[in-house]
């Protein structure tokens, strides 16, 4: 459905704008696929959390995700349904951890955040073979700023909010480590198709 919609919309632009080249149309199609894919996944996950009455937690963890992952990088699934499944699992893990995990020793938090900042400084942003990082220094600085912001907020928040921040950062840092040590980078199928057709 997403492929069908993006293809037809991009063809509409092509038919009504003769200035667009084939590559321009493919770029429009790729962008539309990405937007529609992300939007549909957000709506589905939103409905799941609406059903279990955990919308505030979902939105908060979603904000953390979108203020760290685009800067640090992360693992991508090959298919839409694989990504949707992993995304639901990701937010469910955060939900369970947030609600059930007890408060830990202060020293643990200090060590964890120091290691997280160090890993971010050394490895972020993660490499991507299809979309090379051109502004690595800027992204690294922004990654550290984002992480520092959430660490400060962590110490100003109640336990469940702290748990949400902690597990969100942990899952992000784990991805950074995996990508840089094992080379596990799964580019989305539509990324591969688009770049193959435009090279």
From Swiss-Prot:
It is found in: Cell membrane. It is a multi-pass membrane protein. GO terms for biological process: proteolysis; quorum sensing. Keywords: Cell membrane, Hydrolase, Membrane, Protease, Quorum sensing, Transmembrane, Transmembrane helix. Its main location: membrane. The chain crosses the membrane at residues 43-63, 81-101, 108-128, 139-159, 165-185. One of its GO terms (molecular function) is peptidase activity. It is an enzyme of class 3 (hydrolase). SMART domains: AgrB. GO terms for cellular component: plasma membrane. May be involved in the proteolytic processing of a quorum sensing system signal molecule precursor. This is Putative AgrB-like protein.
